[in-house]
Amino acid sequence: MGVNAVHWFRKGLRLHDNPALKECIQGADTIRCVYILDPWFAGSSNVGINRWRFLLQCLEDLDANLRKLNSRLFVIRGQPADVFPRLFKEWNITKLSIEYDSEPFGKERDAAIKKLATEAGVEVIVRISHTLYDLDKIIELNGGQPPLTYKRFQTLVSKMEPLEMPADTITSDVIGKCTTPLSDDHDEKYGVPSLEELGFDTDGLSSAVWPGGETEALTRLERHLERKAWVANFERPRMNANSLLASPTGLSPYLRFGCLSCRLFYFKLTDLYKKVKKNSSPPLSLYGQLLWREFFYTAATNNPRFDKMEGNPICVQIPWDKNPEALAKWAEGRTGFPWIDAIMTQLRQEGWIHHLARHAVACFLTRGDLWISWEEGMKVFEELLLDADWSINAGSWMWLSCSSFFQQFFHCYCPVGFGRRTDPNGDYIRRYLPVLRGFPAKYIYDPWNAPEGIQKVAKCLIGVNYPKPMVNHAEASRLNIERMKQIYQQLSRYRGLGLLASVPSNPNGNGGLMGYAPGENVPSGGSGGGNCSQGSGILHYAHGDSQQTNPLKQGRSSMGTGLSSGKRPSQEEDAQSVGPKVQRQSSN
């Protein structure tokens, strides 16, 4: 009897650096590459049309690349637990390979499939290639707990074994005599479906700003590295108006779907740095967003409640407001703040926004202005953001809402001043909010302050053609900072964490506390690897390296009822606080 192998694609939609597929092919007589698509999931899940289109383009590209090797992709409708027992029998399978999935849901799913495979006498090959490191080894090195500060994570990574080189690309030489049994009705049975077949209405759908697939990913990688001439001086390009637009060298959606190997990216960066710096070893910060990606994956891998506040041992329990109307205005770009609305419009139209734009809208929704739970924002990003990834999306939202990882809650983005500093002329606003196109730069970020005559000339009356601001930012941000301060003071008393820093008393700009200048070193929000093309860097928040465990296990009840009153804590309470150290480091 021959050796019949199946490789199951999930993420990792590529033929380069695919060690599980490469090992599966070795010694096999036949190989079939499958992708399992649940049609019910397509119609009911919280995933928008742009993300589905990107995925289908990835599958089409993968199929096209397999065709060049006299093989094909088998897209199978159904659920894995139902599909595999049938395939094992029908195709007489003896070997199954998968890329290791570190997320709790993926681990549970894969354990069930491995059990079915064992019962059917099928060998299972699992290899790590979606992350740079074996996350379990990082946790083991840290005494069995995930590191919860980036500084600690860097320390652990520096002690790890050197990374393995990327696996050879699957070519006809690698496949050798291994064949793929194909039938004449392959397209009918196993073809990649269209958006329409999945039930999506594509009328009025604009062309993709981010085309999916490995071919596009590798082209972008080469362009990205060509732009990395700044590596010579180890400097980052400054953020400007153009940074806000989708870049032809952006990589984050490709890393999220595994069209691009993070290992290949890592080693290409390393080679470039060594070439420029005459073989000196690159600092960890060169790999900025790749390491933030690993950090969040590590934090999430053993925590099935990572995307929830309640029951999540690393998440501060904050009594957020429930306000569906305000949430809808934010999600649909109807807040009355052009900077926020333009960002949310770009997100809905294109499926991507710059990482600092993510910070701005996340802060506005949560601790900055609306005091709505980060879980609600995370769900909107999950629907709309091409690079939304369970671990990174949840981790970034906890981080940006000061619910975990980061406690400098007095750093608040101003929804007027931040945009104005980034794009003084307002071209970004005009592009995504054409209704405001007629406003001069002086008023385009706060059009409600424009005299009525200017509004008439612009053919846009505030409150009629464009909404008035939904909130007074100066008042809301001040109140919310006080709310956060009280929550963290209670934390400090209950747990002795000493996480508070002194709160500046005078907000600048339009009442917002500008915590970060555009282009500062901060991790991306909600992204699979962030926007690597922008050279985004790192801001390290080190509270020492002691482990932060169960920040507020007591939950909501322990915090009393006065937390939203805005009452300023006493000077004695202020004196008990300990300010976190902020460490800057050059970015990648």
From Swiss-Prot:
What induces or represses this gene?
Answer: Expression is regulated by light and circadian rhythms. Peak expression in the suprachiasma nucleus (SCN) and eye at the day/night transition (CT12).
Quote the biased-composition stretches of kind Polar residues, using this chain's numbering.
Answer: 545-568
User: Coordinates of motif LIR 2 in the sequence?
Assistant: 82-87
Q: Where is this motif: LIR 9?
A: 395-400
- LIR 11 (motif): residue ranges: 430-435
Which residues does the annotated region (Interaction with TIMELESS) include?
A: 471-493
Q: How does it get modified after it is made?
A: Phosphorylation on Ser-247 by MAPK is important for the inhibition of CLOCK-BMAL1-mediated transcriptional activity. Phosphorylation by CSNK1E requires interaction with PER1 or PER2. Phosphorylation at Ser-71 and Ser-280 by AMPK decreases protein stability. Phosphorylation at Ser-570 exhibits a robust circadian rhythm with a peak at CT8, increases protein stability, prevents SCF(FBXL3)-mediated degradation and is antagonized by interaction with PRKDC.
Gene Ontology molecular functions: DNA binding; DNA-binding transcription factor binding; double-stranded DNA binding; E-box binding; FAD binding; histone deacetylase binding; kinase binding; nuclear receptor binding
Motif (LIR 4) spans which residues? 255-260
Q: Which Gene3D superfamilies match?
A: 1.25.40.80, DNA Cyclobutane Dipyrimidine Photolyase, subunit A, domain 3 (1.10.579.10), HUPs (3.40.50.620)
Kindly state the positions of the motif LIR 3 in this protein.
151-156
| Motif residue range(s): LIR 12 | 486-491
Return the motif ranges for LIR 8: 379-384
Q: How does it assemble?
A: Component of the circadian core oscillator, which includes the CRY proteins, CLOCK or NPAS2, BMAL1 or BMAL2, CSNK1D and/or CSNK1E, TIMELESS, and the PER proteins. Interacts directly with TIMELESS. Interacts directly with PER1, PER2 and PER3; interaction with PER2 inhibits its ubiquitination and vice versa. Interacts with FBXL21. Interacts with FBXL3. Interacts with CLOCK-BMAL1 independently of PER2 and DNA. Interacts with HDAC1, HDAC2 and SIN3B. Interacts with nuclear receptors AR, NR1D1, NR3C1/GR, RORA and RORC; the interaction with at least NR3C1/GR is ligand dependent.
Report what the protein is called: Cryptochrome-1
